[in-house]
Amino acid sequence: MHGVAAKPGVSNRPDLSYVFSYPFNLYRTPGGEPWCPSAGPTKPALFQCKPAIRCSPWFIELLYNPWWCTAADGSFGACCPDVYKTTASVARFPESSKLTAMPRDITKEEMTRAVTVARQHVEEISAFEWHAWSNMLAPWQNSAAYSYSATTYASLIGQQQGWKGLQSVEASRKLANLLKLEPEYAGFSLQHLCVRETALSSICREQPKCNSSALYRTYDASCNNIDYPNWGRSNSPLERILPPQYADGIWAPREWPGLPTVDSVSRIVQDIDYPDNQLTITVMHWGQMIAHDVTHVPTFRTLNNSAIQCCTGDGKYLSPERTHPLCFPIDVAHDNEFYGQFGVTCHDFVRSVIAPREDCKFGYADQLNQNTAYLDASVIYGSTEKVARSLREYAGGRMRVTIIGGDYVILPVDPNRKDCITDEYGGECFVGGDQRVNQYTGLTVLHIVWVRLHNKYANQLSLINPSWDDERLYQETKKIITALVQHITYNEYLPSVLGPNLMGEYGLLPLTTGYTYTYDPAVKAQVTNEFATAAFRYGHSLIRNYNELWLDDTYANYGGELYLKDWYNNPKVLFDPIVFNALIRHSITGTAQNFDENVVDAVHNYLFKSPYQSWGLDLIAANLWRGRDHGIPGYNFYLEACGSKRAATFDDLLPIMRPAIVEKIKYLYKSVDDVDLFIGVLGEWAIKGGIVGPVTSCIMADQFARLKDGDRFFYEHGGQSHSFTPAQLDSIRSMSLARVLCETSDTVDWITPNVFWTPSPMNPWVPCYGKDIPRLNLNLWKSTY
């Protein structure tokens, strides 16, 4: 196994002696009659005995009140309540628009002049790039900066949208200067002016024509909302919970005197090994996959599609005349304990691509989301027709794959991609629905798993329905896979992060039976900037430095560790089936790190490190810097937006944040209003039943409510021509990530019912082949036409 560490001594091995308690596993369920708590001696049971996976939303409660039972089908069961109805619960944030009248009318000549200046600005960038390209100003391949640029790669459509957005923003800046608008109101006052009435009218996105009776999603998510067909579409702007705080009101980053450097803020984050003994690393992996499904904010590239270099190869600043206008490098202090030893004072960072405003008005900048906003499995299938078609086999509804040794199936390989690390083992890149498929091995494993399952189901459906052609097999299988991704997210993943109480408040709990009727075309399913840039990056705290490789189901044959910092953008190790299956076992037993302000070195100091460098980038500093690039207001403003009283002093944060983090930030920030949202996310006390804090959970719950109630194709919705039948929906509700892993692994035969939680008496080891891990009944998809 290439690059896998040698087997460590006994003292370094994780203690997993409890996971195979054979007496317990021989009698996985204690037997006897099911027993569930009742409301009283003569009253019916409060809870129902169900197969364990149907009680996933209440797993945290079951850990402390282990109400197990034997389900009616003889499988391991648990006692939990039914959910019969749910209500829509989005748009909780107060109206915060600062749309104000302009101080005077703008003349046609002034408008023309502003547009001319904007176009000249783009031409100046083009001239700079021509000169820079002749001087080879681009990150060298196999550097951390190059890998980071590949992660934030802008597609051709994304680049085109970005340059259109840039012209609109530069014209807005010129108009704001002409009108002498204060930064607080500049981005709002200009929204009275329409781009369509200028020479920039071509940047406005047209509305697609929709077929309201279509049975399947479009490739780019257009027409999901018939009333607003561009909502949620790929290459659209992110939504905002609160207006941005740009320094100039238009696009200048959130930077002003008194704000601490992000390097200094990042240094309050430490690498302390503090595992969460209840949650597995699957929580982090799944969250990353979902993040890549609903959002991809690219960074600007040159007009000829080259990555932009902002620092020298050894981490120094470029001279001003050689620095690209779209660079926004991170300043690293000379006394930085880690980077100082290498003389690094500059980290590459390029500004995020901005999109033309949806309303085609002038005003402040909104960043581009290159992926579809809906939770539609686009991470597997792609967010554009071009990508989706490139991944298909066009036979039997299957996806393209690579087959090694006759039976080992992995993702297709693109020999033309150059963004994977090249060393003695690597160089070959996988391709998938999302550009970041090769980012790290745990994520790539999930990509392989889902493509395997798609092809397995497509083959089975072709036997059940011999008359179905390739297109129907592909679309029906994709529809099933998308439903499974949604169900696992809402039934298993979100309860482990948000807890059942908050999910109930936001109408996020899956129903026990029947349909939901909460689809609302007025709900904008767009991903919010705050979710993408800060709140959903909570998972970076869960990352661990290495993966443990267990070579068989006895968990006695240990294959060593796979260190994250050694395998960024290098999927070559997954060409070995032993490693692939070992990583699946790790996802069942490996614990996540505790959610707090501690983050491992693999991402804090070695992000995207290549074999040719001694250091990588700093993910924490990058997250903070990205928030300022996007003009994200401070944490305190979101505290108020989420219904709490805004803090007047740092000590007012103590009921919400851990004291240690409050003490650190009060010496860094001059004002409590300045505290960056992301560092606030890391410092919060957890809400009841969840692992994240009140502001983080507020932003996340609102987002997932939007992704449910704003998605016409959401798997539980009834009353639509494309809705699943009641029997099909019930079978989908019986599914779990455990079953998905059982179906797609090669040598994993034992698993726990809920792989988001570590093995325990309420989450026992069970065989993949038994009743305890229900299968999807594909016979329910047998068609008469």
Model regions and ranges:
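Short, recurring structural edge motifs at helix starts
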Residues: 63-68
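Terminal regions of secretory-pathway proteins
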Residues: 3, 9-41, 45-48, 52, ...
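Intrinsically disordered, low-complexity regulatory segments
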Residues: 33, 54-58, 447
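Hydrophobic faces of stable alpha-helices that mediate helix-helix packing
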Residues: 451-455, 632
